[in-house]
Amino acid sequence: MLECLIIGDSIAEGIGQYRLDCVLEAKVGINSRNYVETYTLPESKLTVISLGSNDLGMSNQYTVLYNLRSEIKGSVLWILPANNDEARINILTIANIHNDKVADIRQLSLSKDGVHPTTKSYEALAKQF
């Protein structure tokens, strides 16, 4: 079993640069459905999930994220996307059901695109677990 696993999109990749002790399974631009269809989750004591930023207009997002979360045995920290309110609501609902922790990147400085954290914000996120 892994100690720490970071999964998801480009935001997960950014966080992973500051947590070399964690296994990183992420891909720039991937949406939640494609992530679930592409990757197999190893067991981990802690899983950090950054998905939802690339899900705009995706049908069944809640079901995809709920099923993903249901496969995870250890504790979870969700990274709320800055740009997708539907994903934020779905993630908060799922996190509440499972008593997961949540980090809101809207509370940190974002880069000019309004989606990705700044370098300092990535560092701050990495220190939350």
Locations of the language-model features?
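Alpha-helical cap/lid subdomain in secreted, periplasmic
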Residues: 21, 34-129
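Serine-esterase "nucleophile elbow" of acetyl-processing enzymes
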Residues: 1-46
